């Protein structure tokens, strides 16, 4: 799905979907390359430190660059597998190793405080429909696998609509 393979299949057989096109999925699955692309458009992103498996790194340098708290995540993984929120520099190395269990590249990104929202858009027969904005409220520390797939989050449409019209 997130690699673009499932989206590509749906596109080929003409089934509408609310996920990104297969090309966009492929672009965004490599988080490091996607952030470089976004930065090339002069858009702001979280501060980032990229590590390849086997590369030497210094946790103090990483913490200084991105700050604490921060997120450690596999570069090419979906569904929040391998992601950790790190609130103590002493845990950074362990969480980097945890993320490496999902792949050969890891990103450490600065924590951005705020609300998380989702907006679906669907095109059917050339007609674009924008679905309602929803705020994601995780019962966990962040929007992790359990929050996404095991019901440990709430989507709050009414609150987002109130904020948007207020």
Question: Where do the language-model regions lie?
Answer:
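Short glycine-/acidic-enriched loop or helix-start segments at secondary-structure transitions
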Residues: 2-6, 81-82, 118
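Short hydrophobic/aromatic-rich motifs at helix boundaries and adjacent loops
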Residues: 5-9, 66-68, 149-151
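Active-site nucleotide/adenylate-binding loops and adjacent lid/helix of ATP-dependent enzymes
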Residues: 27-115, 126
């Amino acid at each position: 799905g997130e690699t673009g393979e499932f989206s590509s299949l749906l596109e080929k057989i003409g089934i509408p979907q609310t996920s990104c096109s297969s090309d966009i999925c492929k672009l965004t699955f490599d988080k490091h390359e996607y952030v470089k692309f976004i930065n090339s458009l002069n858009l702001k992103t979280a501060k980032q430190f990229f590590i390849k498996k086997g590369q030497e790194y210094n946790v103090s340098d990483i913490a200084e660059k991105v700050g604490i708290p921060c997120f450690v995540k596999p570069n090419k993984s979906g569904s929040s597998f391998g992601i950790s929120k790190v609130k103590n520099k002493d845990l950074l190395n362990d969480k980097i190793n945890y993320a490496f269990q999902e792949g050969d590249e890891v990103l450490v990104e600065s924590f951005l405080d705020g609300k998380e929202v989702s907006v679906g858009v669907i095109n059917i027969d050339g007609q674009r429909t924008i679905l309602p904005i929803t705020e994601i409220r995780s019962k966990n520390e962040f929007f992790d696998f359990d929050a996404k797939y095991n019901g440990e989050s709430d989507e709050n449409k009414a609150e987002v609509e109130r904020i948007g019209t207020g």
